[in-house]
A protein has these predicted regions:
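Short, conserved, GDST-rich strand-edge loop motifs in beta-rich repeat architectures
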Residues: 143-161
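Short loop/turn segments that connect beta-strands within beta-propeller blades
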Residues: 45-48, 102-105, 171-173, 224-226
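A short loop-to-beta-strand structural motif that recurs across blades of beta-propeller domains
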Residues: 40-42, 97-99, 164-167, 219
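Gly/Ser/Thr/Pro-enriched helix-cap/hinge segments flanking short amphipathic alpha-helices
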Residues: 116-118, 157-334
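Beta-propeller blade termini
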Residues: 14-24, 28, 43, 70-79, ...
Length: 334
């Protein structure tokens, strides 16, 4: 089946996979992050087969034309363009990649000109993902770091085996800043990080982070204070589509803001699975004007308005099947 689908690639070393509709044709494509081999971007042709478009799209190599050591990857619309972009974890001395989807079939790596590139030049990133840690409505980036050689500092004095994670705060207008120093003492601990995933473990609306590490226990970082802004979380139940609604596109409309969307997805990051429930940060907004859920079956459910600070269950073809309030924290917006 893999060979017939055009995905058979025994020469590559795949470590991270993300699904995205990069060309806006309504079909889910596949991105594969490869270690020391060109990345692959498999365009879904709609007939059960795929064609590699990575070179033409500008995501196969670095800007210098070199194949990097791709590890983890995630896809999301971090700039409200309506198009999914890519974040990729790479080897030390390569920096992370932030491929912005230009909407023309081409991606441009924004990392070398941003705080992301400067901060990640010496780190080796495995797990990475987009998520809105402060619920301001803009997707931020988390990266779990750690080298593969425990004596790397002998040959590269500025590179260490255990490394701190990165938390990049999205300031809007394609600008990020590293927020790790302000995120609390827990994120200052150096780890040989590998997998990374997120979930709201305490039902308070903000997203917590789990990181696995070599030769050490997993670390669960609870997000305290991220819910000072409002949020809405959407749980999907498929009927004609798959049970969990994987592949559904959830779009929310807010007063005076661009429509925001997320995909109910599996995979992404590195060796990890985050929760399926999309979480939308609403900032100061207290309700969602409207919501669309576009299911893999083709069914479209129109819902709303909805009050903020709840987890809403949507059943395919039936609309809202239930809603549960989120547990608010001291300092949360009323």
């Amino acid at each position: 089946m893999t060979r017939r689908a055009g995905l058979y690639d025994p020469a590559s070393k795949a470590l991270g996979v993300a699904m995205l509709d990069f060309d806006g044709d309504g079909r889910m494509d596949l991105f594969v992050a490869n270690d020391t081999q060109p990345n692959r971007l498999y365009r879904n042709k709609g007939d059960g087969t795929f064609a590699d478009a990575a070179v033409a799209a500008g995501v196969a190599f670095s800007e210098a034309g070199v194949a990097r050591a791709g590890m983890g990857v995630d896809a999301a619309d971090y700039d409200d363009s309506g198009r999914p972009s890519l974040v990729i974890g790479n080897f030390s001395n390569e920096m992370m990649a932030l491929y912005h989807n230009e909407g023309t079939g081409l991606f441009i790596d924004e990392a070398p000109r941003s705080a992301i590139g400067r901060a990640s030049l010496l780190t080796l990133t495995f797990g990475c993902f987009f998520f809105d840690y402060d619920l301001d409505g803009r997707l931020d980036i988390f990266a779990a770091n750690g080298h593969v050689a425990d004596d790397i500092d002998r040959v590269q004095s500025r590179v260490t085996y255990a490394q701190r994670p990165h938390l990049f705060h999205n300031l809007g207008r394609n600008t990020f800043e590293e927020a790790t120093p302000q995120a609390g003492a827990a994120l200052q601990t150096k780890l040989v990080g590998r997998g990374a995933a997120y979930a709201d473990i305490d039902n308070d609306g903000d997203l917590d982070v789990l990181v696995t590490a070599n030769n050490a226990p997993a670390r669960l970082f609870r997000n305290d204070g991220g819910n000072r802004n409002n949020a809405i979380r959407i749980r999907t139940i498929g009927t004609r589509s798959n049970r969990d609604g994987i592949g559904a596109r959830v779009e929310v409309s807010l007063r005076g803001a661009p429509r925001r969307w997320q995909i109910v997805k599996t995979g992404s990051s590195y060796g990890s699975q985050s929760e399926l429930t999309p979480t939308f940060g609403l900032g100061a907004e207290t309700k969602v004007e409207g919501m669309l859920v576009k299911w893999p079956s083709g069914q479209v459910d129109t819902i709303g308005p909805l009050e903020a600070n709840q987890i809403v269950t949507v059943r395919e073809g039936a609309g809202v099947a239930g809603a549960t309030p989120l547990r608010s924290a001291p300092g949360a917006r009323p």
